[in-house]
Amino acid sequence: YKSKIKMESFASLIKNRRSTRKFTDQLLSPEQVEMILKAALMAPASKRKNPWQFIVVEDKEMLKKLAGCKAAGSSFLEGCALAVVVLANVMESDVWVEDASIASIYMQLQAEDLGLGSCWCQIRNRQTEDDTDANTYVRNLLDIPYQLEVLSIIGFGYKDQERKPFDEAHLQWEKIHLDSFKMPEENKEA
C-alpha cells in the first residue's frame, strides 16, 4: 500500500496553523462544520473509549456569554463563527484529558486544512474574572451533566488576520534528547 497523501502537506499544515483570535463575520458552511466535527470523532482515544462529547455553539448571545469564561484569553470567542465546547466523561476514562486534547487539535488541524482559523481556549483549571471556576461557569451556561468535565472551547471562523508561518529558526532543538536526558553544558553543575 502506498499513500497518495504527500508528507509535505502535513508539514505545511503544522507550520502554517497559528492561533487566530480575529475572525470575519462570515459563517461556516454546514459542510465545513461537518468536516471539523468528523475530525474530532475520528481522533484516536485510549482503548477506543471515546470519552469525549462536543457541544457546537453558533448562537451569538451564547458565544458572548462563553467569552466571559476566563479572566483573560477568552474574549475572541465572541467574534468567532462557532465554538466547540470539548467535554469528556471522567468516569469513562482516566486519560480523558489526553483523549479530549487529541480530538481538539484534530479539529484545529482540519480547520486549517479548510483555510479556516481556530483558537484554543483552556477551561480546565482556569477561573473567570470573579474567580469562579471556569468549568463550573461553562457547565452552568450549557446544562452540562456532572460526570462531564470541560477541557476547552475551540473557536472557529474565517481569519480576519494573517499570521506568518511558524519560523523554524525558533525551533528549540535543545529540548530534544537522544537516548537519555542530557543537560546543556552551560547548565551542568561542576
Region spans (language model):
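Acidic, surface-exposed loops and disordered segments
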Residues: 3-190
